[in-house]
Amino acid sequence: MLLKADFHIHTREDPHDFIRYTAVELLEEAARQGFDVVALTCHNKRIHSEELSRKAEELGILLIPGVEAAIQGKHTLLLDMPYARLKVRTFDHVRALKRDGGLVIAPHPFFPAPKCLNGKLRENLDLFDAIEFSHFYTQTLDFNRKAVEYARKMELPLVGTSDCHRLWQLGTTYTIVDAAAKTIPAVFAAIRAGRVRVVTAPLRPFDRLRHGLKERRNRLRVRSEGLLGSALRFPSGAFPSIAQARIHSARGAERRLTRSEDAFR
């Protein structure tokens, strides 16, 4: 079965970012957009609960417990792993934790920010089941390109995510998973087997402006409250221009993606 999924989403319960909508409001919007699978991945906090799971089930959504953890200072998505019960701080901790299952995704791995994986992805490649294709790119500025090339080279699947911090971001980029069933094990098995495709389109200039304003508000809040900021800062400069994203499956087959695949919305 084909499942519309997003594996990287933040909500108001996130301790590191100023977000207006709650987890319940996010689930309601995801249901409105026709999502089948959602992972809530707040920074260093696993917010999954029986109440949220029941709400998701009522809405027809498979809810995957998750967290965007700072592992040796690098953002790493841990899905369906008991992060809250253990002090997971190093990649060796993640290796030990993964023996009991779960899925590990490299989020925005080559973006120009200290908290992005970059070289740590290469050093710990055995840990990662998939690489993220982030919603944050335009036709002239695209930090996903290196991730696409690296995923193809390493024969790892790409999963599209919104990294949602504002509701308008949900649905900008997502994944279609061809799973045997609508269960966490079946979804994870499909990802590992490369039975996924990314649905995406570059942000419009106005969307990028909104994104920048959001990051500025986050930084102001961080300074006023003395918190450790998690905003990504993107330097100005010339980057190769692309007119359309080219996404590669785990087997290296090139796939052009357009909004025509939005039939799943």
What residues fall within each predicted segment?
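Charged catalytic cores and adjacent phosphate/nucleic-acid-binding surfaces used
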Residues: 1-7, 11, 15-28, 46-61, ...
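Divalent metal-dependent hydrolysis catalytic cores, especially in the metallo-beta-lactamase
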Residues: 6, 27-44, 102-105
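N-terminal processing/targeting junctions
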Residues: 14, 100-103
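Secondary-structure boundary/capping motif
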Residues: 35, 95-98
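Aromatic-lined carbohydrate-recognition surfaces of secreted/lumenal glycan-active proteins
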Residues: 105-113
